[in-house]
């Protein structure tokens, strides 16, 4: 495997320094959300201005509380994940991420997807930033690596697909991913493989 390093803009650096404050305070501030969305997808930044400060604090407080109450899982790579645990994992991911208006049961968006500027990839990035041992970041680049070329053209932004993606990171078929010891490291590598940063 050859690793080519590309210089990232400062806003593209994963804002790990925010995690302790967020988890301690129990919510994400508007400024922190801006930094997180800028890291994951600059496309959503302008949309963030459509959220009120109260919405950002309230919706992210639900997420942080949900992560703290959790599943009793501290690391999916270090846990013998039974079908029952995966069902619980999927339900929790679905609850925290939520559903967009067009897919919500009553037409009302839920979870993090209630926030303007937060789509499925950004929602998984929020979970992955705050709980990287349990929730990976899932985006179109990683989808292409894990499910094959063209996979991002199909509907992949669902809790069942997120579960399947996570299971394939926990038990990867790609040799390069098997060598990586952290879930976050594996999802980063999956993105980089598709983007051509890692050559396999």
Listing of model-derived features with the role each one plays in the protein:
Residues 21-22, 36-39, 66, 70, ...:
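Residues that form generic nucleotide/phosphate-binding pockets
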Residues 13-65:
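Small-residue-rich anion-binding loops in enzyme active sites
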Residues 40, 63, 92-93, 130, ...:
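Alpha-helix boundary/capping residues
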Residues 44, 101, 134, 150-151:
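Secondary-structure boundary/capping signal
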Residues 45-118:
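Helix-hairpin-helix/helix-loop-helix acidic hairpins
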Residues 105-147:
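Catalytic DNA-binding helix-loop module of base-excision-repair DNA glycosylases/AP lyases
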